[in-house]
């Protein structure tokens, strides 16, 4: 059976989450009237401002950073960063009210990814404790002989 490190699994889940966000946004462009609305300088009836664009950039940059942080952060910081960020994004995407079937589909996929990130990070046990206990067992075994 193929085993994958927890860091790689969490990073892959963030990539899956990002792909769903990106393709949902791309999908919006084929919705009738979407491009025309954007060309008027509004989105969902709200004016498109520099602040709104900056907020959108920050909101997408956090999951992008989590792809990298999931690979690079040490165990404790990694585990809690994944739990906290995934929980915050879960609340955020749940607050988006939508009735479009394609949006609902992507929302379900994003929610599933975030749930699995939280579940995986929560169940993740400190690998150094396991290594330490294994080395203690090895030392104990040598002393008995």
Question: Predicted segments — roles?
Answer:
Residues 114-135:
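Membrane-water interface at the C-terminal end of transmembrane alpha helices
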Residues 17-51:
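Hydrophobic transmembrane helix segments
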Residues 78, 89-107:
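Membrane-helix boundary connector in multi-pass membrane proteins
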Residues 58-66, 86, 110:
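Core segments of transmembrane alpha-helices
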Residues 1-20:
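Cytosolic juxtamembrane helix and N-cap/initiation of the first transmembrane helix
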Residues 50-58, 108:
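Structural signature of hydrophobic alpha-helical transmembrane segments
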Residues 60-80:
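Juxtamembrane helix-break-helix junctions at the cytosolic face
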Residues 102-120:
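Alpha-helical membrane-associated segments of multi-pass integral membrane proteins
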């Amino acid at each position: 059976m193929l085993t994958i490190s927890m860091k790689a699994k969490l990073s892959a889940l963030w990539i899956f989450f990002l792909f769903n966000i990106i393709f949902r946004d791309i999908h919006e462009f084929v919705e009738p009237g979407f491009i025309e609305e954007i060309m008027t300088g509004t989105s969902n009836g709200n004016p498109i401002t520099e602040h709104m664009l900056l907020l959108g950039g920050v909101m997408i940059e956090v999951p992008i950073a989590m792809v990298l942080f999931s690979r690079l952060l040490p165990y404790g910081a990694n585990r809690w960063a994944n739990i906290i960020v995934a929980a915050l994004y879960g609340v955020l995407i749940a607050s988006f009210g939508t009735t479009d079937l394609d949006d609902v589909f992507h929302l379900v996929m994003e929610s599933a990814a975030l749930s699995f990130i939280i579940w995986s990070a929560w169940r993740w046990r400190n690998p150094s404790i396991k290594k330490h206990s294994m080395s203690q067992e090895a030392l104990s075994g040598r002393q008995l002989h």
